[in-house]
């Protein structure tokens, strides 16, 4: 057992939390390390079997099990369930951040392990006899010799568990993930040395001084020591003191009952292992090796499929079980059961049919001959079904432990071990072939887990008491039955084909190569049948998988096609498979719960819908965009699961206080300057025996909340008492929008409960104008609303691009339609702050952070929608803005105190659109409902579209000519000439239009996930001024003589391409490195810049910078030397200025001349969705 990185200490002394991109990078690194560990570990087992053969491998396998058995009994079994939570609590509560607790823990663990290691080495002959029985076929002296050399691993196995737990609580996951790889590499190297050492392994008699024996035993133990050494180095790098400190912490004593239960659980399970090994070793010399290798083969697909599924579901399942949220637990059980069954049942069918071929393909090498590989294959076929009950038992145990019922699993393990022992005792009497006994032992093991699953089901049903008396819903049962039927049909047909085609001859005559070919044929037979049956039965996971395959194929085709089509249409992307879930809010301090389910679309609809686009936001009229919303038709919703960080410029996760909106005018900051610790965890009953404070988590970028489920990425503002965050769902590897409700815990319970209840009702609104609510949680310090992440830009970012009026009002219709649907459902959207609103990449204005306060009403929504439209039109916010500033400037007001109409600010805004924005913002504007507002928006859009259509040019009156029967030659020639001129002009216009369209499409589809601008969102009409370069500021151009990359805190970014920023060619550019962290400055280094050396000392007037990135901020600095040592050696000429994609001009107020000008990137933006800045041209103008 290995500790889980589930809980992280939050005391001030703890290590800093990982940043958002660092988390993603570490997650991928851990996944890669796990894959390498499994590959090298299995290669090690195969090599060992091939070198030693089945009989000798049995001796080594039994001896190598002993250190794991002893370590599990002494320490490992209790460490994950007991020590890790206590360690996390110590780091939170202790003044020294848990340093003394860690020292006591390591001292106690080392003492116990040293004693256990010494005793186990001394008792090696007894332990071997316990495992082999009284009359084994396995070489007992050789096994004992190996045991003497391998049992010292007990010490390092136990310490590895301790060190992993300490590192995990410090957010250090790399070394624990790679340490097993080091162990496997050392073990493989040991096998190479074993082959190189001359002589033979002494078997009869066994000599402890035999070179090969010592190399194999000591080398294997050295690998485990190397694994622990890697962890110890990481411990020292974290400056964690391990100096001995004697004493037992009182917190450990409280967990004595649970520790006793865990030890008893492991002891009973190890009893079944001992009985199985004794019977296997008595039956045949190869028995233990086949018995153990069978289990290793079964764990390969389980580790890649079953563990992945369980890892996704178990964190939420544990939280809900700990919170005693029975409906949520039932929903999670149903989801986990469904995902487990649909992935493992086909795997079991394939392994059952192809078992003999699998054994030969994997192990028919060297001294592990074809006969032993065949028996191993038979064991795989007989015990493959074990995967399913094994996974279900793990699910059930997690629920019991989360509900603090450690003694209940004892009943399950007693049943499992009892059936397993009974079946193991019967195995030698079932078959007359001693070599097949190991296969029937695997069958007995599976029957034991099956019995445990059945007993666990009834115990869980009695404990949870589900409505209707069933833990699994009808939908889940149907999916399981369909999957079973499809797997049975596919397996039966594959077995018949295997017999009729004589595929077994491939294994018999071609060995492992023939077995691989045989498995390929079986897979080609089974896969189409499984796919056809599940797709015809409309299993949602199958349809989602089909969509994913289609998307992958299409993306590969598009990569080889023109650049203008290198991105899939959103409608072709597969959506996530979701399931209807029964949810309720956890009761706040004894209050009544809200029995409001979160409604989702049926899985079939979700799988069928995929990622459909909303109405496009363009300047041309669209009937679908206008009347679809009016009719209330259910529009497909975009799903934003891709990792795309949209950090608002200049936003800082500052404190949020709670003044009344009327008390703060637009742009005012709250007075509260400190945010206290905030606890976010599943609600549970207070501990009667402990008064320990709750787990406190500081709301800062990189912090983990909800037991590590969500990692905070970027703060997006807030309005009292709410905070808006972009976060990463680490379980599902997708981004989400988190709205923290009353994180400081000042609202009354009834107000908080009413807020969460109203927000829960928003989950029923299925409109593109409101982000889909995924979860609503009542925590110990407020509430948490989890919604889908809306890819695109904030309202302020999009307003800053000056979108066209027609595009703006068309984009607003999605939000108005969502408000209309919400008001009809009896709930308001609470559009009270510009930071709540985002513009999606599909051109929809969306309520991105749902959370409806009790005082919210439909009239406030109308004003909020009008204010959002007003902001898109003139880049001003017309309403009072409480909380954290959004970046929008306040609107100017007329003599009556009303915001000035947008048309008075910009004469190019159509009167109808301006009137809608102005009237909806005013309290007495006459717009009383969202449906009226939506209708006015559609009418204004239609009128604006008609006024933009050019009428025909009136021709001068021409006297009517007398009609003739046939045109004369002069008229015919003139008409022919005019026709040719018209065709030529039309062709020229068409060619220019096609070139412009290709350029626009290339920009849009070539950078969908990159920076935002008005053309990509379809919010701006093309104008001549947008493509023309800005007029040159006064003063002469100063051409730099040299440019170098200035990076005092790290390596220079692409120094060889620095000249491209001043070469006068906008098509070339200097790019920074691509950073994994979306905000690398100043966390990774303080920044990077370009040092431009001027031909002579010059008073700089303006600096023009052309960039392709979004969100980049630069400072203009001067230096006395071209190579200053630090950034402090330069002088700031202009403060940080946000750059827009395209041409930017920065005015420099410098009185003194300078010969060295530094363009310093203080904030890195994004280019094509990557954390990278791209500067194509820098032009310097002297002061006039």
Curated annotation (Swiss-Prot):
Comp. bias intervals (Polar residues): 561-573
Post-translational modification: Phosphorylated by PknB. Phosphorylation recruits FhaA.
Extracellular side: 63-67, 129-145, 198-212, 276-294, 365-374, 431-435, 498-512, 1001-1184
Gene Ontology terms: biological process: lipid translocation; lipid-linked peptidoglycan transport; peptidoglycan biosynthetic process; regulation of cell shape
Principal location: membrane
UniProt membrane topology term: Multi-pass membrane protein
GO MF annotations, alphabetized: lipid-linked peptidoglycan transporter activity
Transmembrane segments: 42-62, 68-88, 108-128, 146-166, 177-197, 213-233, 255-275, 295-315, 344-364, 375-395, 410-430, 436-456, 477-497, 513-533, 980-1000
Chain residue ranges for the region called Disordered: 557-673
Membrane topology (Cytoplasmic): 1-41, 89-107, 167-176, 234-254, 316-343, 396-409, 457-476, 534-979
Subcellular location: Cell membrane
Phosphothreonine: residues bearing it: 947
Keyword check for Transmembrane: yes
Regulation: Probably regulated via interaction with FhaA.
Biased composition (Basic and acidic residues): 593-603, 613-622
Superkingdom of the organism of origin: Bacteria
Role this protein plays: Essential for cell growth and peptidoglycan synthesis.
Family per similarity comment: In the N-terminal section; belongs to the MurJ/MviN family.
Entry domain remark: The extendend C-terminal region contains a kinase-like region, which encodes a catalytically inactive pseudokinase, and an extracellular region reminiscent of carbohydrate-binding proteins.
Protein name: Probable peptidoglycan biosynthesis protein MviN
């Amino acid at each position: 057992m290995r500790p889980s990185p589930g809980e992280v200490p939050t005391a001030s002394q703890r290590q800093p939390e990982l940043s958002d991109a660092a988390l993603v990078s570490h997650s991928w690194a851990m996944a890669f390390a796990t894959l390498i560990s499994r590959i090298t570990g299995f290669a090690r087992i195969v090599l060992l079997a091939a070198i030693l053969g089945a009989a000798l491998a049995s001796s080594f396998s039994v001896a190598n099990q002993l250190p794991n058995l002893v370590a599990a009994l002494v320490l490992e079994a209790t460490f994950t369930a007991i020590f890790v939570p206590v360690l996390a609590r110590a780091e939170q509560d202790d003044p020294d951040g848990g340093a003394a607790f860690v020292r006591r823990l390591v001292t106690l663990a080392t003492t116990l392990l040293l004693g256990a290691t010494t005793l186990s080495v001394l008792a090696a002959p007894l332990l071997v006899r316990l495992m082999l029985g009284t009359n084994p076929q396995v070489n007992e002296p050789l096994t004992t010799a190996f045991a003497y050399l391998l049992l010292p691993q007990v010490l390092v196995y136990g310490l590895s568990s301790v060190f992993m737990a300490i590192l995990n609580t410090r957010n250090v996951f790399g070394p624990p993930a790679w340490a097993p790889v080091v162990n496997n590499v050392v073990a493989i190297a040991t096998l190479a040395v074993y082959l190189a050492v001359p002589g033979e392994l002494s078997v009869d008699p066994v000599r402890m001084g035999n070179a090969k024996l010592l190399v194999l035993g000591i080398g294997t133990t050295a690998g485990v020591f190397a694994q622990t050494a890697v962890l110890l180095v990481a411990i020292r790098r974290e400056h964690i003191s391990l100096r001995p400190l004697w004493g037992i912490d009182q917190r450990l004593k409280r967990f004595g009952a649970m520790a006793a239960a865990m030890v008893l659980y492991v002891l009973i399970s190890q009893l079944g292992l001992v009985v199985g090994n004794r019977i296997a070793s008595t039956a045949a010399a190869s028995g233990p090796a086949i018995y153990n290798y069978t289990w290793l083969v079964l764990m390969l697909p389980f580790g890649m499929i079953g563990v992945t599924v369980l890892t996704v579901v178990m964190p939420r399942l544990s939280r809900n079980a700990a919170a005693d949220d029975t409906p949520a637990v039932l929903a999670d059980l149903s989801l986990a059961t469904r995902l487990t069954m649909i992935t493992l049942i086909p795997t079991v069918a394939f392994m059952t049919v192809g078992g003999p071929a699998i054994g030969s393909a994997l192990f028919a090498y060297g001294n592990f001959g074809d006969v032993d590989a065949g028996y191993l294959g038979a064991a795989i076929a007989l015990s493959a079904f074990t995967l399913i009950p094994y996974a279900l038992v793990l699910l059930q145990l997690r629920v019991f432990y989360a509900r603090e019922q450690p003694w209940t699993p004892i009943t399950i393990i007693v049943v499992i071990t009892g059936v397993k022992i009974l079946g193991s005792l019967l195995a030698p009497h079932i078959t007359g072939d001693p070599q097949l006994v190991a296969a029937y032992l695997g069958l007995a093991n599976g029957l034991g887990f099956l019995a445990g699953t059945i007993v666990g089901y009834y115990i869980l049903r009695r404990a949870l008491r589900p409505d209707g008396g069933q833990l699994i819903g009808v939908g889940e049962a149907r999916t399981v039955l369909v999957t079973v039927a499809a797997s049975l049909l596919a397996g039966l047909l594959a077995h018949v084909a295997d017999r009729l085609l004589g595929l077994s001859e491939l294994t018999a005559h071609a060995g492992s190569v023939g077995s691989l070919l045989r498995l390929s044929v079986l897979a080609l037979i089974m896969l189409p049948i499984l796919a056809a049956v599940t797709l015809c039965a409309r299993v949602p996971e199958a349809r989602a998988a089909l969509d994913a395959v289609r998307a992958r194929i299409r993306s590969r085709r598009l990569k080889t096609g023109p650049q203008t089509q290198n991105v899939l249409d959103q409608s072709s992307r597969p959506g996530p498979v979701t399931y209807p879930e029964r949810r309720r809010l956890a009761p706040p301090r004894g209050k009544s719960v809200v029995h409001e389910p979160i409604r989702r679309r049926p899985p079939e609809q979700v799988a069928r819908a995929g990622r459909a686009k909303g109405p496009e936001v363009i300047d041309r009229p669209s009937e679908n965009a206008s009347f679809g919303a009016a009719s209330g038709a259910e529009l497909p919703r975009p799903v934003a699961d891709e990792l795309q960080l949209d950090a608002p410029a200049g936003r800082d996760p500052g404190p949020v206080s709670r003044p009344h909106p009327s008390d703060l005018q637009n742009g005012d900051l709250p007075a509260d300057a400190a945010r206290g610790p905030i606890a976010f965890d599943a609600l549970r009953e207070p501990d009667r025996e402990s008064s320990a404070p709750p787990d406190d988590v500081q709301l800062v970028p990189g912090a983990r909340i909800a037991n590590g489920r969500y990692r905070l990425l970027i703060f997006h503002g807030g309005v009292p008492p709410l905070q808006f965050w972009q976060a990463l769902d680490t379980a599902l590897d997708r981004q989400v929008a988190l709205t923290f409700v009353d994180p400081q815990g000042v609202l009354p319970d009834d107000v908080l409960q009413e807020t969460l209840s109203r927000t829960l009702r928003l989950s029923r609104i299925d409109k593109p104008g409101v982000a889909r609510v995924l979860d609503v949680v009542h925590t110990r310090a407020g509430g948490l609303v989890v919604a889908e992440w809306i890819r695109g830009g904030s309202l302020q970012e999009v307003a800053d691009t000056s979108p066209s009026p027609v595009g703006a009002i068309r984009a607003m219709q999605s939000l108005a339609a969502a408000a209309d649907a919400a008001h009809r459902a009896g709930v308001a959207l609470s559009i009270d702050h510009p930071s709540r609103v985002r513009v999606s990449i599909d051109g929809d204005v969306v309520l991105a952070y749902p959370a409806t306060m009790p005082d919210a009403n439909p009239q406030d929504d109308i004003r909020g929608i009008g204010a959002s439209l007003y902001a898109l039109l003139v880049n001003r916010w017309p309403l009072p803005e409480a909380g954290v500033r959004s970046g929008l400037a306040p609107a100017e007001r007329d003599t009556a105190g009303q915001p000035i109409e947008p048309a008075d600010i910009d004469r190019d805004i159509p009167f109808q659109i301006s009137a809608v924005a102005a009237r909806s913002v005013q309290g007495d504007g006459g717009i009383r409902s969202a449906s009226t507002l939506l209708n006015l928006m559609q009418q204004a859009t239609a009128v604006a579209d008609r006024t933009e259509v050019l009428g025909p040019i009136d021709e001068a009156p021409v006297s009517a000519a007398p009609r003739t029967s046939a045109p004369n030659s002069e008229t015919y020639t003139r008409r022919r000439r005019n026709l040719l001129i018209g065709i030529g002009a039309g062709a020229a216009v068409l060619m220019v239009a096609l070139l412009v369209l290709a350029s626009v499409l290339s920009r849009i589809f070539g950078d969908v996930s990159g920076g935002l601008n008005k053309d990509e969102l379809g919010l701006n009409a093309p104008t001549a001024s947008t493509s023309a370069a800005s007029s040159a500021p006064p003063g002469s151009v100063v051409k730099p003589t040299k440019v170098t990359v200035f990076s005092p805190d790290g390596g220079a970014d692409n120094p060889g391409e620095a000249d491209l920023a001043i070469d006068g060619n906008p098509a070339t550019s200097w790019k920074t490195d691509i950073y994994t962290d979306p905000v690398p400055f100043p966390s990774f280094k303080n920044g990077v810049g370009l040092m431009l050396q001027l031909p002579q000392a010059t008073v700089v007037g303006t600096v023009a910078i052309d960039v392709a990135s979004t969100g980049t901020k630069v400072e203009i600095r001067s230096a006395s030397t071209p190579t200053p040592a630090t950034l402090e050696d330069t002088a700031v000429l202009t403060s940080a200025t946000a750059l827009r994609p395209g041409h930017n001009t920065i005015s420099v107020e410098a009185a003194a001349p300078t010969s060295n000008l530094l363009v310093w990137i203080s904030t890195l933006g994004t280019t094509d969705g990557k954390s990278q800045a791209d500067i194509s041209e820098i032009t310097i103008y002297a002061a006039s």
